Amino acid sequence: MNRFTAYAALFFIFSLCSTAKEAGFQHPAFNFRGTSTMSALSGDYSAAPTPLYKSWALPSSLNLTTQPPPLLTDRSYYELVQALISKMRLDCQTVGDMTWRHLSEMLFASWNSVKEVSLKAASVTLWAIISIWFGLYWTLARLITLFLWTFSIEALCLILLGCITSLIYKGALSLSEHLPVFLFMSPLKIIWRAAFSKRNYKNEKAVEGYKGFSVPQKPPKSAVIELQHENGSHLGYANCIRLYSGENALVTAEHCLEGAFATSLKTGNRIPMSTFFPIFKSARNDISILVGPPNWEGLLSVKGAHFITADKIGKGPASFYTLEKGEWMCHSATIDGAHHQFVSVLCNTGPGYSGTGFWSSKNLLGVLKGFPLEEECNYNVMSVIPSIPGITSPNYVFESTAVKGRVFSDETVKELEREASEAVKKLARFKSLTGKNWANDYDSDEDYGLEKEAATNAPAEKTAQTNSAEKTAPSTSAEKTAPTNKPLNGRAAPPAKTNGNSDIPDAAISAPPMDKMVEQIITAMVGRINLSEIEEKIVSRVSQKALQKPKQNKRGRRGGKNKQNNLPPTSTQSISGAPKKKAVPQASGSAGISPATTTPAPKEKPSGGKNSAKFIPSWRIKQQDSAGQKPDLKLNSKA
């Protein structure tokens, strides 16, 4: 029954639609269009659909009659149902849009109100915390101020007592931390040093079974010097080395320093070792490195040699130098191995050899200590130079090849370096009882006193001394100016020998460098330079050289040089104002007194005759003792 009813209803609706279509209720001239969601949101709430007229269905312009719109009842059920559905959809959309708009406005207003209330609550809370905190500090400050104002003396006493109590507490805490360790380690250190460190050594011996040899030979760079007692008797030796800091120093055994004088065989000067400042000293290893007073290398005529530190010493042959009957002798030796913190050396030594250096080629390995008094120790021992960064080794670490036959182990090298660094720090922290160190005592230095006195009376005397020095020829002044050695600590060095005809005053010889004097000299020298004259002479000389014919180089002839100078001799004015040097005669004449210096004059040949002068004003006989064929005498006069 229900199925029949449904079929009947569908048939009825279909028949109505088809009847209306056939009857002409749906005219093709128009269609229905509903409003969209955007038109509803924009405010267009028209429910009825608007017809869309087709362009071809519009009435002709000639037809003036208009047909009235069809009635709603004349439409078909399909059109009515479509219009009803469109109307319901538009009304639902309108109601939904209005509801969503009202809900969003309400939510936005609620969010703003909640946000405003939260910000106000947070601000009130923060200001409450600030007020409470500031109130506590303000109250505390007022109480402290009131207390200090009322009880000033009592408050000051309490503050002082609090500071003292704090210091006492910190001192007691530090003492309680370090005192047990100190009390426990001190006896162990004493026992260790008594058992192992204080070994008995004797200062020289000949090794049984070792056959060495000796040859006359001077030390490299004259770096080995003799140490003497005050009465001039022999004491030992010291060695000059070049440190990594750039200065020279003396290395010797520590037991050779007391009452010793460094003596030079070349110059004969003596410098007491008490004037040397130790930068490293070790009584346990029996070695000292000392830096001397100013110009001590020149007084002793020594140069700094290279050396090898303890971590790079290997086994192999070596040599050492001694002084026998006023001549240096080189003796053979062999580096054998290690003996605790020393190096065992096979060599034959005798009394007075202490401090002499053992050399490998031109490198110093160490200094002689002596030999141990232990059983089965048939060798001498050598004190080595430890590696001290910045002094005996560079401050940086670099990679190098391993030493073949290395003497010391890594543990021994580290122990030597640790002891050396502690000794250097101890010397750096050293302060004498008077509060002054050797390097800071300028007032007792006689050289400093002479320099200070010469610096006070500089202005008037320096100009006259400068003029006189400029007028003196360099060769003459080199022969006549021999500076005297100043006394050192009350012991004067032997005076230098001169010919007695020195034209330069004493103050000019030992005048210290002063800024004002140098400025005055430079100003005077620059003022005397005539640049225009120099330019003219240069141009003339260059033009004459350019116009001169090239010389023919005749090779294979022996004898004198056949040169002809067609140019007239021109005397150019020296910048320093000194007159032109006179030509030195080539014939042998009376030899002058040799200057008191160990350094030869610059540009001076050690042997043979001097070169011919560039311009010879008159002919002279050439030197008779020259080798080769003697040419005929020729005249050479001025052009």
Curated annotation (Swiss-Prot):
GO annotations of cellular component type: membrane
UniProt-recorded Gene Ontology molecular function terms: RNA binding; serine-type endopeptidase activity; serine-type exopeptidase activity
Post-translational modification as stated in the protein's UniProt record: Specific enzymatic cleavages in vivo yield mature proteins. The protease probably cleaves itself and releases the VPg protein. The VPg protein is probably further cleaved in its C-terminus.
Keyword Transcription: no
Composition bias type Basic residues, residue spans: 551-561
InterPro entries: Luteovirus_Orf2, Peptidase_S1_PA, Peptidase_S1_PA_chymotrypsin, Peptidase_S39B_luteovirus
Ranges of Polar residues composition bias in the record: 463-487, 562-576
Site, as annotated: Cleavage: E204, K205, E399, S400
Catalytic residues as annotated in Swiss-Prot or TrEMBL: H255, D286, S354
EC number: 3.4.21.-
Stretches for region Disordered: 456-510, 542-639
Keywords: Hydrolase, Membrane, Protease, RNA-binding, Serine protease, Signal, Transmembrane, Transmembrane helix
Signal peptide: 1-20
Similarity comment: Belongs to the peptidase S39B family.
Function: Precursor from which the VPg molecule is probably released at the onset of the RNA synthesis. Essential for virus replication.
Domain notes: The C-terminus part of VPg/P1-C25 displays RNA-binding properties.
Protein name as catalogued: Protein P1
